[in-house]
Design a protein with these regions (language model features):
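The feature captures the beta-strand-to-loop junction immediately N-terminal to the Walker
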Residues: 21-23
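Helix-to-loop junction immediately C-terminal to a conserved catalytic motif
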Residues: 36
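Hydrophobic anchor residue at the start of the ABC signature
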Residues: 148
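Conserved ABC ATPase signature
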Residues: 134-138, 142
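A short, proline-enriched helix->beta-strand linker immediately N-terminal to the Walker B motif
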Residues: 153-157
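Conserved ABC ATPase "signature" region
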Residues: 52-54, 83, 87-129
């Protein structure tokens, strides 16, 4: 096969922003997907906090990927889309079942915390009025904010964003960069 990306060496520190800039097709998205573990590099290492994650599943890398296509669940409301990563992370297998989960005492306090985290992110992104809607009822910019929120709510070690602010109004773009 043909090599798409050569000689990439990134060292990013806490609180630092790094932007990959280049023409369409030069490998920016592929680089992000390799870091996230969604694609495998043919050589070299991907390390996070000095630890190689080459053999680490994407779900265990503590990274949040925001795709240009949003990747929202169309059958879920905005609230449910925001809650999904927290439910997967914080609830046990049995607590995730709607009927059975309600019988488990530990589920209630976890769900209260999940709701708080969703509320904080929805306020930050100004999407509270959208929480009961489904993605198909939203504009492109609104969907993008929901996708950002789903990444933010997890509070990951790092965000990998593939053109995350491209569909937003200039004032909201500035607000989110500051956040």
């Amino acid at each position: 096969g043909q090599s798409v990306i050569n000689g990439v060496d990134l060292d990013i520190h806490d609180g630092e922003f790094l932007t990959l800039v280049g023409p369409s097709g030069c490998g920016k998205s592929t680089t992000l997907r390799i870091i996230a573990g969604l694609e495998t590099q043919s050589s070299g290492d991907v390390s996070i906090d000095g630890v190689s994650v080459n053999e680490t599943r994407p779900s265990l890398r503590d990274l949040a990927m925001v795709f240009q296509s949003y990747a929202l669940y169309p059958h879920l409301t905005v609230r449910q889309n925001l809650m999904t990563p927290l439910r997967l992370r914080d609830l046990s297998f049995w607590e995730r079942f709607p009927l059975l989960g309600h019988l488990l005492p530990s589920r209630r306090s976890k769900m209260v915390q999940i709701e708080k985290e969703v509320q904080i992110v929805s306020e930050t992104l100004k999407i509270e009025p959208l929480l009961a809607r489904k993605p198909g009822q939203l504009s492109g910019g609104q969907r993008q904010r929901v996708a950002l929120g789903r990444a933010m709510v997890r509070n990951p070690a790092a965000f990998l964003m593939d053109e995350p602010l491209s569909n937003l109004h200039a004032s909201l773009r500035l607000h989110l960069r500051a956040e």
